[in-house]
């Protein structure tokens, strides 16, 4: 009973966290990061204003945009829901899994990470979207979904002991998976850094075309693509290592990871050469964050 209870709470927390990453990405691509210029309130209110007349006199009314304000407010509210979900999960872990270090510590680390990232969200606003703080915010989110995914799969193993009792990965596979996870995190951060630099260059050079903005990045722009193809080759190597795997699910996941990396590279190259909708960038980043969690499984 306790195994299933923790598994459900961990799974819900993981799904909600991925949804939060999506909404956070929507905040980024829509320019809603300062949709609520103060924190934790929004224009001095616990619920965002619906008209300019509701804005306090000490806040510049020209900064108000009802759509951006409610997108940012939705992001914050979802963050609160994720926080409470992880608190419930942690309480279950403390009550029933004090002798299971994998479950207990995954829950405690999740609680720490969601709390730290919530506090960092306030700093993101007060720093006026400082690129370094925004990147750190993303790193903690990736660590959070990784730890949650780990706790979820460990609790699933407890429910299905017969299926997983004789399964162990070789050292070569384990090292390759850890390397793949680390490289994907670095790849996401590189992509975020490139986008941030492009936005900063565009502010100083508003007449630059997309090609000129990319040229201004110099050799930095190639790192993202080179690392992307490195990930592709590493995933091919993992497919080779899993060729004789007796557990079909593991083999299918590795093939799925390979397919997602291939698609992400294709989508990334399209974004370089064509003017695709901003939502394309959102799904590009979100898809990469899913890879981080799937590798843990």
Identify what each model region corresponds to.
Residues 187-231, 236-240:
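Membrane-interfacial catalytic/cofactor-binding modules of polytopic membrane enzymes
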Residues 12, 16-23, 105-124, 179-187, ...:
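Small-polar-interrupted transmembrane alpha-helices in polytopic inner-membrane proteins
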Residues 6-40, 182-193:
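N-terminal signal-anchor transmembrane alpha helix
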Residues 82-88, 141-159, 229-237, 288-297:
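Hydrophobic cores of alpha-helical transmembrane segments in multi-pass inner/ER membrane proteins
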Residues 29-72, 200-213:
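Extracytosolic (periplasmic/ER-lumenal) interhelical loops and adjacent juxtamembrane/interface segments
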Residues 56-84, 219-225:
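Individual transmembrane alpha-helix segments
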Residues 92-108, 171, 239-257:
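Membrane-interface helix-loop-helix junctions at transmembrane boundaries of multi-pass membrane enzymes
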Residues 26-36, 115-138, 195-206, 265-289:
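Interfacial helix-loop-helix junctions of multi-pass membrane proteins
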């Amino acid at each position: 009973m306790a195994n299933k209870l923790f598994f459900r709470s961990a799974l819900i927390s993981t799904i909600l966290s991925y949804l939060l990453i999506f909404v956070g990405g929507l905040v980024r691509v829509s320019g809603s990061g300062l949709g609520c210029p103060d924190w934790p309130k929004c224009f001095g209110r616990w619920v965002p204003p619906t008209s300019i007349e509701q804005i306090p006199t000490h806040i510049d009314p020209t900064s108000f945009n009802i759509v951006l304000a409610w997108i940012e407010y939705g992001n914050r509210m979802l963050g609160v829901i994720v926080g409470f979900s992880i608190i419930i999960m942690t309480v279950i872990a403390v009550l029933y899994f004090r002798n299971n270090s994998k479950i207990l510590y995954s829950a405690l680390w999740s609680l720490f990470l969601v709390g730290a990232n919530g506090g960092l969200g306030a700093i993101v606003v007060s720093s006026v979207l400082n690129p370094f703080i925004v990147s750190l915010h993303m790193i903690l989110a990736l660590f959070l979904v990784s730890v949650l995914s780990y706790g979820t799969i460990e609790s699933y193993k407890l429910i299905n002991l017969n299926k997983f009792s004789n399964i162990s990965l070789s050292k070569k596979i384990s090292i390759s998976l850890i390397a793949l996870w680390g490289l994907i995190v670095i790849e996401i951060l590189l992509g975020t850094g490139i986008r941030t630099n492009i936005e900063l260059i565009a502010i100083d050079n508003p007449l630059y075309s997309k090609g000129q903005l990319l040229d201004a990045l110099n050799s930095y722009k190639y790192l993202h693509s080179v690392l992307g193809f490195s990930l592709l080759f590493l995933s091919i190597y993992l497919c080779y290592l899993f060729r004789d795997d007796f557990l079909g699910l593991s083999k299918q996941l590795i093939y799925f990871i390979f397919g997602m990396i291939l698609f992400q590279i294709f989508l990334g190259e399209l974004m370089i050469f064509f003017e695709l909708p901003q939502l394309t960038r959102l799904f590009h980043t979100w898809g990469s964050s899913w890879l981080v969690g799937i590798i843990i499984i």
